[in-house]
Amino acid sequence: MKLLNVRRHSSNGFTLIELMIVVAIVAALAMIAYPSYSQFILKGNRGAAQSYLMDIAQRQQLFFNDSRTFAPDANQLNMTAPERVQDNYTVSFAVDLNAPPTFLITATPKSGTRQVSDGPLSIDNTGEKLHGVESW
């Protein structure tokens, strides 16, 4: 009796349909995740700017205690903006030396960055914080 030698050939790859299904699933997940990621980056950059503005305001108060005037810029306070802030915001100082002396520090989003839609952030000598027209 002779046995037939039949070999089974197994497929060791993926079919085109299986690959297309995986690509479609990955694309759907990316469409869901990207807006959340963008919001995460926006909030992170805003948080960095808020923290920097708080640091400046605190140093302004210390500077005022020593010199009875507010510093006109961050250089006088020996401060440098963190990279996240430098890349996304322009920080400006408005100092009024008339009695009583006041300051307003504003971080305005740079054009061409994600932060443009976020609006300016500011803090004054009383500690009042503004985000556009709202408080932080």
Q: What do these predicted ranges mean?
A:
Residues 19-36:
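Alpha-helical hydrophobic helix detector
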Residues 42-69:
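Membrane-proximal N-terminal amphipathic helix
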Residues 1-14:
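N-terminal leader/signal peptides at the extreme start of proteins
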